[in-house]
Regions:
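Eukaryotic intrinsically disordered and solvent-exposed regulatory patches
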Residues: 1-2, 29-33, 63, 77, ...
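Conserved alpha/beta-hydrolase "nucleophile elbow" surrounding the catalytic nucleophile
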Residues: 16-18, 87-96
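Conserved acidic catalytic loop of the alpha/beta-hydrolase fold
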Residues: 68-88
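Alpha/beta-hydrolase
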Residues: 136-166
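Conserved HGGG/HGGXW glycine-rich cap/lid loop of the alpha/beta-hydrolase fold
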Residues: 1-60, 64
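Flexible "cap/lid" loop of the alpha/beta hydrolase fold
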Residues: 97-140
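The conserved SAM/SAH-binding core of class I Rossmann-like methyltransferase domains
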Residues: 45-47, 92, 116
């Protein structure tokens, strides 16, 4: 949790995509100079999916990863722990899917959502990972998230140039 929640403002709640954690997914955004003004006015709570935090151990044999629904059901517990009354959810990929499920189940806790690269299918994390590397999805992901993730695509691979930082 970064910042101090204010009674009259929602907390920004982030949820990352698969293969990432809150640092690898959101640090580029939250440490950007232009974002500092927002950070002075809002607290941020960044959630890591099980096993995605830095230094996480591998899962034991036979471990079944929680479904998107189960992951969304953990969020009210996090909010209660930090005494958070409402959030603006910010999710990427599978994190966007999880936050959408959370908002549908707990609409009174959600002021709004910022969703990037959402896939609304009811798939598990393994299926999501497989779809990420499919040819068409990989191109779309790279092109859409390049400005957010500070990735440079070689000119020879660029199909079109999108507005944003280069």
């Amino acid at each position: 949790m970064a910042g101090i929640p204010r009674d009259n403002r929602p907390v920004i709640l982030t949820y990352h995509d698969i293969g990432m954690n809150h640092k690898t997914c959101f640090d580029v955004l939250f440490y950007d100079e232009d974002m500092q003004e927002i950070m002075r006015h809002f607290a941020v709570c960044q959630v890591n999916a099980p096993g995605q935090h830095e230094g996480a151990s591998t899962f034991p044999a036979g471990f079944t990863y929680p479904s998107m629904d189960k992951l969304s059901e953990t969020l009210p517990i996090v909010l209660k722990h930090f005494k958070i009354k409402s959030v603006i959810g910010m999710g990427v990929g599978a994190g966007a899917n999880i936050l959408t499920r959370f908002a549908l189940k707990y609409p009174d806790l959600v002021e709004g959502l910022v969703l990037m690269n959402i896939n609304a299918q009811a798939e598990g994390w393994a299926d999501r990972a497989a779809s990420k590397v499919s040819q068409s999805n990989a191109i779309v992901i790279i092109i859409l998230l390049t400005p957010c993730l500070n990735i440079t695509i070689p000119v020879s691979l660029q199909l079109c140039r999108l507005a944003g930082p280069t």
